């Protein structure tokens, strides 16, 4: 795998065993999320999603804390951009610009939801503010005993706005979400585990990463098409009825599933007592500098 982000070493990417490992690497800044992060992360996730060389994404960080959330430079940069792009004094236009900018920030974590690849997050120390938005978008979360989660925005006089509230009520009881949101208190690892926010808690960082990578390797062995279908079906059920969920998976199976391919490979591998080899689900038909829309148009004309 060869992904382009190397700028200022704010994030590193490693790849092994069909696992793309994204590492936040600003320990001296408590891995706060700078301006570049908000465009770099979706670009990287989308690239991994498109080339399909990786079957799982793991996100972790270096240092004592997972992340202190949005870097203060994002706030000042947004204000400067609004003043530069909207020199007019009309408050409606200024607020409209702010609204569009906020939607753009929200897209950063939407890419995790929209990716067909499972995203696992490993958390140590503080997961604060925007990092909670980040974590709530992931498919699975694991943490160390010293981890804590804090909806920090309320403590600085604002409302969390890039993903916490649309997602956290699907992960935690509503009353608990409101308590965390209204008080800004810290939820520590044992409480997060008891409530189901994290899948497991580990005594130290090394044990956590070892187990997370073991789980990622197990997922990577499965049919990428079946994993994709499972993620789509599970995410689709949010806010929908059982009937709607059943209809969605029925449509998926009749449209995507072929028992002569992945099921045949899985059963043969079990009989032969070996790991199955599933074909990747990639966008390899894309030509250089061609978008997905370009590809669709080209195929329609061929």
Where are these regions (language model features)?
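Conserved CoA-thioester-binding segment of acyl-CoA-metabolizing enzymes
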Residues: 7-10, 14-62, 283, 287
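Single conserved hydrophobic/aromatic residue that forms the stacking wall/gate
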Residues: 1-9, 13, 285-302
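Glycine- (often His-adjacent) and acidic-residue-rich active-site loop
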Residues: 61-108, 157, 241
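CoA-thioester-processing core
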Residues: 108-114, 122, 128-182, 195, ...
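Helix-loop "lid/cap" segments that line or gate small-molecule binding pockets
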Residues: 180, 233, 252-257
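Acidic, divalent-metal-coordinating active-site segment for phosphoryl/phosphodiester hydrolysis
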Residues: 185-191
């Amino acid at each position: 795998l060869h992904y382009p982000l190397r700028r200022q070493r704010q994030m590193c990417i490693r790849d092994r065993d069909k696992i793309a490992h994204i590492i936040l690497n600003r320990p001296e800044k408590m891995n706060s999320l700078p301006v570049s992060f908000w465009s770099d992360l979706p670009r990287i996730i989308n690239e991994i999603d498109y080339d399909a060389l990786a079957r799982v994404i793991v996100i972790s960080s270096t240092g004592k804390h997972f992340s202190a959330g949005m870097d203060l430079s994002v706030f000042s940069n947004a204000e400067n951009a609004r003043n530069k792009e909207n020199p007019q004094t009309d408050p409606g236009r200024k607020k409209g610009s702010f609204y569009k900018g906020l939607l753009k920030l929200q897209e950063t974590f939407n890419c995790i939801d929209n990716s067909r690849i499972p995203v696992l997050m490993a958390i140590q120390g503080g997961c604060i503010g925007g990092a909670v938005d980040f974590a709530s978008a992931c498919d699975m979360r694991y943490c160390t005993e010293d981890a804590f989660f804090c909806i920090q925005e309320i403590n600085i006089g604002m409302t969390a706005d890039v993903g916490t509230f649309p997602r956290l009520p699907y992960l935690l009881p509503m009353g608990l979400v409101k308590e965390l949101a209204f008080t800004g208190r810290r939820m520590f690892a044992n409480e997060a585990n008891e409530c189901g926010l994290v899948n497991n808690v580990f005594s130290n960082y090394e044990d956590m990463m070892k187990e997370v990578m073991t789980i990622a390797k197990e997922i990577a062995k499965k049919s990428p098409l079946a994993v994709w279908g499972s993620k789509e079906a599970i995410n689709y059920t949010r806010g929908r009825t059982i009937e709607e969920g059943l209809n969605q998976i029925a449509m998926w199976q009749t449209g995507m599933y072929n028992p002569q391919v992945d099921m045949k490979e899985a059963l043969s591998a079990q009989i032969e007592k070996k790991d199955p080899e599933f074909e990747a689900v990639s966008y390899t038909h894309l030509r250089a500098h061609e978008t997905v829309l370009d590809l669709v148009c080209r195929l329609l004309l061929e």
